[in-house]
Amino acid sequence: QKPNFENKQVAVVGTGSSGIQVISQVAEEAGKLYVLQRTPAYTIPLQNRPVDPGHATKMKAQYAELRERQRNSFSGFTLVHSDLAPPPTQSALEVSDEARRAEYENRWASGGLSPYYAFTDSLLNMESNQTLAEFAREKIRARIDDPVIAEKLCPQYPILTRRLSPETRYLEAFNRPNVELVDLLETPIHRFTEQGLVVGDTELPLDAVIFATGFDVMTGAMDRIDIRGRDNLTLKTRWSEGLTSHLGMMTEGFPNFFWINGPHSPFYNPILLAEYQCDFICDLITDLKADNTDLIEPLPEAEAQYVQLTNDIGNSTLYPQSDNYYMGDNIEGKPRNTLFWFGGFPFYRKQCRLARADWSGFRVE
């Protein structure tokens, strides 16, 4: 049942992706909305729009080419304005200011995740990254009436190192008279009271509090299943000192246990990744059955090599330059590791093919 916030005093804690979606809607309903922000988010207009029937027909005719491009692309995202787009070939610093801005404007108008791959080095070079970051901050300032509020909503960390959040009417919410931004770095939350929340030295009278404080990415859901491996070892205990895996699909000590779209998997189109990993696992099982074997698990040394490669790739990017869930920073006590494979899908596929060539990185019985 949809909650009714009409004439209610509401607080939303958190301005990540979930908070942004909630705030956009609740701002239009609540009598008063307090937005409790610790870290501002880079946002991009979602640009949802009706699909023209002619465009749908065109895309279906190009479907084979689209999938081929996606399977050979770094991230699996190859559309701009819902049409096929070539992969980037240049640094953001190799083009003129005018050409760079035109590219950013084009992708901003496209919406969604289009800016991720405008140039080859947006996540590798800080100077290149900051050209996009300042462009995004300009877009934020242009939509906020109060310049003080606008600056509080402008992130300063490298763009794309935290999730880029598509939105509709989010920034405009802060122009409404019933919406108040509370900067938790200036006035932190102290406690709940019977009437609401105390932030700084002020008590906010509230009818409802909505927590949009994120979740334990990649490992959290698997931890909660209480998966147990050899010697009754739990997966949560196995990963308590840092994430380990081989090929982002299995881990030593848990024979015949596979996952898809999980820890250490590529930052890639999740539909195509699930398809590839399912095929890999099914082919592996078929080969094992043909050889009359019924157990497989990674060898410790093979797993260590994959983990090291994953972390080395992650450390070569800008992701470690901010606190983010890609590195596990949003969960207190979680070891800081690269949780995703950031080396692109073609290189990941090469690792999988090498592993399957002779199974030398696995214990097979």
Model-derived segments and their meaning:
Residues Q1-K8, T15, I20, A30-E365:
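N-terminal FAD-binding dinucleotide-binding subdomain shared by FAD-dependent oxidases/monooxygenases
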Residues V22-V26:
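Aromatic pocket-lining residues of Rossmann-like dinucleotide-binding sites
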